[in-house]
C-alpha cells in the first residue's frame, strides 16, 4: 500500500515537471509557521553561511594544521608553527579559498542560466567535494587543491544566492530578505571562529608543541563540517523545494507554475502585474543584450570611463583596508601584538560576534542616510582607528597598554566597516551603471575585489611577522586615499534612477536613455500573461510592455539581485 502511494506521488511529480501543472502547494507543510518566501530564503542562505564559514575556518585551525603536518621541525624533531615553510604553506592554503573565489564568481553568471535552483544544487555539490577533500587531506598539495575547490564554490555562492533571493521574494520585502545573505555570511564567519575555541590556547609560533589526538581530528572536523550543511541544502532543494524561481519558470514557458508560486510568495490570488513585470523584464534583457557594450569598449568611452574606474577603485581599496585579513588571519594578527595566547581566539570570536550584531542593526541605515554619507562616515571611523593603532605601535609595541589600545582600535574599525564600506559598496556599484554596461562593469569591479583580497591576504603572514605596524600602516594609507577619492568624486545616488544620476546628467550615452528604451518598448505588442485568467485580465486592462515597464520603474526584476551584498 505504502509502495503504491509512493509510486503515485512519484508519477505526479514527474507529470508536474514535464507539463505546466502547478503542485497543490509550494511551501513545506513541516514548517507552516513560515511563509513560502521565508522558507525559500532560509534554504538559499545556507549557501551564504557556507561562504562565511569557509572564509574563516582556517583562521583558528591553521596553526594546528602546520603542527600536525610537521611543516616546521627543530633539530630534535619537535613541531612548531613559525618557520619559513610553515609561513609559505599556511599563507597559500589560507589564500586558496579567495583565489578559487575569483574563478567561481566568473563562472556563477553562466551557471545560473541552467536554473537558479540547479545552480545552487551544483554549487553545494562542489562545496561538499571540497570540504570532504579538505578533511581527508594528507599533505600540502591535497589540502591546497581542496581549498581551491571550496573557493570556487564560495565564488559561485556570491552570484547564485543573491539572484535566487531576488527572484523568490516579494518586491516590497526584497531589500529586507536580501540582507539575510549578508547576515548569514557574518554568522558563518562567527561560527567558523567559534568552533576554534575547542582547540584551546593557540600555540606560540616558536614554541615546540605536541598536537593532541583531539586537535588532530578537530581541524579535519572543522574543514569537513560544511559538507553536512551542503548535503542538507541539496536534500531540501531536491526533495522539499523541487522547483525553480518564477522568473526561470516563465523563461521555460511554465506560466501556470510561475503564477501559482507567485500567489504563495505574495499571499494573494491576483499576481497579473507581477507576471507581466517578469515578461517585460525578459524583453528588456533581450534588447539590452543585443545593445550591450563590452566593458573594454565602455572604458575607452569618455562617458563611462570615469564611473567604471571609480567603481573599480572603490572595490579594490575595500580590501586594502585590511578587512579580510581580520576575517581570515586575525589569530596571527593578535599574536603579532604579543598578546597572551589564551586570549587570541577569544578576541577573534568577539570580533566576529560584533560583526554579526552590527550587520543586524545597520540594515535600515542605507536608505535613510544615503550612500555617500555612510561611505564617508565609515572611512573616517576606520582611518581614525587604524591611524591611532599605527602611531601607538610605532611608539612602543611591547607596551601592554598599547597592545590593548590596538585591540580596541580593531574593534572600532569593524564598527566603521559594518555601517558603511562593507554593505554600501555592493549597493553602490550596482546603482551607478546604466543597463548597457551594468553586467560587464559590475562583474569587473567584483572580480577585482577578489583579486585585491588575494593580494592583501597572501602576504599578510609575512607582513605580520615584520610587526603589526607595517600592516596597519598600509591600511591607514589606503583609507586616507579612499576617503579623499570618496569626498571628491563619489556622488549621492539615494532615491535616484539612472536617468537622474549625477554621473550621466547632461552626458551623451552610447545607447540613449531609459526614456528611449521605453519608446522602443512602446512599439511592442502587449504580451499575454498566462493561459486563462491571466491573459484575459491582460486583454481587459490593455496592459502592454510599456505599462509594466513603468510600473517596474524601467528596471528588470533581476536588477536588485546583488543589492545589499558584502564580500566579507
Curated annotation (Swiss-Prot):
Gene3D superfamilies (alphabetical): MFS general substrate transporter like domains (1.20.1250.20)
Temperature-related properties: Active from 32 to 42 degrees Celsius with D-glucose as substrate. Optimum temperature is above 37 degrees Celsius with D-fructose as substrate. Loses activity at 24 degrees Celsius with D-fructose as substrate.
Cystine residue pairs: 72-83
UniProt KW Cell membrane keyword: yes
Compartments where located: Cell membrane
Listed GO MF terms: hexose transmembrane transporter activity
InterPro entries noted in UniProt: GLUT, MFS_dom, MFS_sugar_transport-like, MFS_trans_sf, Sugar/inositol_transpt, Sugar_transporter_CS
Family annotation (Pfam families): Sugar_tr
Cytoplasmic side: 1-32, 108-119, 164-182, 242-306, 367-374, 428-443, 491-568
Main location: membrane
UniProt topological domain (Extracellular) ranges: 54-86, 141-142, 204-220, 328-345, 396-406, 465-469
Protein's membrane topology: Multi-pass membrane protein
UniProtKB keywords: Cell membrane, Disulfide bond, Membrane, Sugar transport, Transmembrane, Transmembrane helix, Transport
Disruption phenotype: Reduced growth rates. Attenuated glucose uptake. Reduced parasite motility in minimal media that does not contain glucose. No significant effects on parasite motility in minimal media supplemented with glutamine. No significant effects on virulence in mice.
Domain of life: Eukaryota
GO cellular component assignments: plasma membrane
Regions crossing the membrane: 33-53, 87-107, 120-140, 143-163, 183-203, 221-241, 307-327, 346-366, 375-395, 407-427, 444-464, 470-490
Annotated catalysed reactions: D-glucose(out) = D-glucose(in); D-fructose(out) = D-fructose(in); D-galactose(in) = D-galactose(out); D-mannose(out) = D-mannose(in)
Protein activity control: Inhibited by cytochalasin B.
Subunit structure, as described in the record: Homodimer.
Functional description taken from the UniProt entry: Sodium-independent facilitative hexose transporter. Can transport D-glucose and D-mannose with high affinity, and D-fructose and D-galactose with low affinity. Can transport D-xylose and D-glucosamine.
Entry's family note: Belongs to the major facilitator superfamily. Sugar transporter (TC 2.A.1.1) family.
Protein name according to UniProt: Hexose transporter 1
UniProt organism field: Toxoplasma gondii
Species classification: Eukaryota, Sar, Alveolata, Apicomplexa, Conoidasida
Gene from which this protein is expressed: GT1
Amino acid at each position: 500500500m505504502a509502495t503504491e502511494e509512493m509510486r503515485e506521488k512519484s508519477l505526479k511529480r514527474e507529470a508536474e515537471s514535464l507539463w505546466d501543472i502547478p503542485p497543490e502547494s509550494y511551501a513545506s507543510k513541516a514548517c507552516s509557521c513560515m511563509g513560502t518566501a521565508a522558507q525559500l530564503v532560509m534554504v538559499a542562505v545556507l549557501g551564504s553561511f557556507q561562504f562565511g564559514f569557509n572564509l574563516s575556518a582556517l583562521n583558528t585551525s591553521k596553526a594546528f594544521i602546520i603542527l600536525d603536518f610537521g611543516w616546521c621541525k627543530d633539530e630534535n624533531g619537535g613541531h612548531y608553527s613559525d618557520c619559513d615553510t610553515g609561513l609559505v604553506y599556511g599563507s597559500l592554503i589560507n589564500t586558496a579559498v579567495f583565489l578559487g573565489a575569483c574563478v567561481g564568481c566568473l563562472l556563477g553568471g553562466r551557471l545560473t542560466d541552467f536554473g537558479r535552483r540547479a545552480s545552487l544544487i551544483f554549487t553545494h555539490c562542489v562545496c561538499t567535494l571540497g570540504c570532504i577533500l579538505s578533511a581527508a587531506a594528507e599533505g600540502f598539495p591535497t589540502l591546497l587543491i581542496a581549498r581551491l575547490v571550496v573557493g570556487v564554490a564560495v565564488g559561485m555562492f556570491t552570484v547564485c544566492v543573491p539572484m535566487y533571493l531576488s527572484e523568490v521574494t516579494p518586491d516590497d520585502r526584497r531589500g529586507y530578505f536580501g540582507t539575510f545573505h549578508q547576515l548569514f555570511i557574518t554568522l558563518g564567519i562567527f561560527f567558523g571562529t567559534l568552533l576554534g575555541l575547542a582547540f584551546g590556547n593557540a600555540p606560540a609560533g616558536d614554541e615546540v608543541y605536541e598536537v593532541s589526538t583531539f586537535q588532530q581530528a578537530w581541524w579535519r572536523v572543522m574543514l569537513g563540517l560544511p559538507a553536512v550543511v551542503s548535503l542538507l541544502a541539496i536534500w531540501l532543494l531536491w526533495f522539499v523545494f523541487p522547483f525553480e524561481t518564477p522568473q526561470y519558470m516563465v523563461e521555460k514557458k511554465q506560466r501556470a507554475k510561475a503564477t501559482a508560486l507567485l500567489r504563495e510568495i505574495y499571499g494573494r490570488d491576483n499576481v497579473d502585474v507581477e507576471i507581466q513585470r517578469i515578461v517585460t523584464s525578459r524583453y528588456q534583457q533581450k534588447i539590452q543584450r543585443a545593445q550591450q557594450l563590452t566593458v573594454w569598449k565602455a572604458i575607452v568611452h569618455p562617458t563611462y570611463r570615469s564611473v567604471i574606474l571609480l567603481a573599480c577603485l572603490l572595490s579594490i581599496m575595500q580590501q586594502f583596508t585590511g578587512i579580510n585579513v581580520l576575517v581570515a588571519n586575525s589569530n596571527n594578527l593578535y599574536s603579532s601584538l604579543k598578546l597572551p595566547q589564551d586570549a587570541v581566539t577569544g578576541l577573534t570570536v568577539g570580533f566576529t560576534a560584533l560583526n554579526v550584531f552590527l550587520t543586524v542593526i545597520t540594515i535600515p541605515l542605507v536608505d535613510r542616510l544615503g550612500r555617500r554619507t555612510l561611505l564617508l562616515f565609515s572611512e573616517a571611523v576606520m582611518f581614525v582607528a587604524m591611524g591611532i593603532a599605527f602611531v601607538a605601535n610605532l611608539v612602543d609595541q611591547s607596551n601592554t597598554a598599547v597592545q590593548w589600545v590596538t585591540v580596541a582600535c580593531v574593534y572600532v574599525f569593524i564598527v566603521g566597516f559594518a555601517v558603511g564600506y562593507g554593505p554600501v559598496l555592493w549597493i553602490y556599484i550596482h546603482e551607478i551603471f546604466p543597463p548597457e554596461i551594468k553586467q560587464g562593469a559590475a562583474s569587473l569591479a567584483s572580480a577585482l575585489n577578489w583579486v585585491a583580497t588575494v593580494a592583501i591576504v597572501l602576504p599578510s603572514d609575512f607582513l605580520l611577522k615584520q610587526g603589526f605596524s607595517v600592516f596597519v600602516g598600509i591600511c591607514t594609507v589606503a583609507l586616507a586615499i579612499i576617503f579623499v577619492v570618496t569626498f571628491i568624486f563619489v556622488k549621492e545616488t539615494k532615491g535616484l534612477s539612472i536617468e537622474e544620476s549625477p554621473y550621466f546628467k547632461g552626458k551623451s550615452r552610447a545607447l540613449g536613455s531609459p526614456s528611449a528604451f521605453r519608446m522602443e518598448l512602446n512599439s511592442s505588442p502587449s504580451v499575454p500573461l498566462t493561459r486563462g485568467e491571466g491573459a484575459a485580465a491582460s486583454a481587459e486592462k490593455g496592459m502592454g510592455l510599456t505599462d509594466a515597464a513603468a510600473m517596474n520603474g524601467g528596471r528588470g526584476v533581476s536588477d536588485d539581485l546583488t543589492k545589499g551584498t558584502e564580500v566579507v
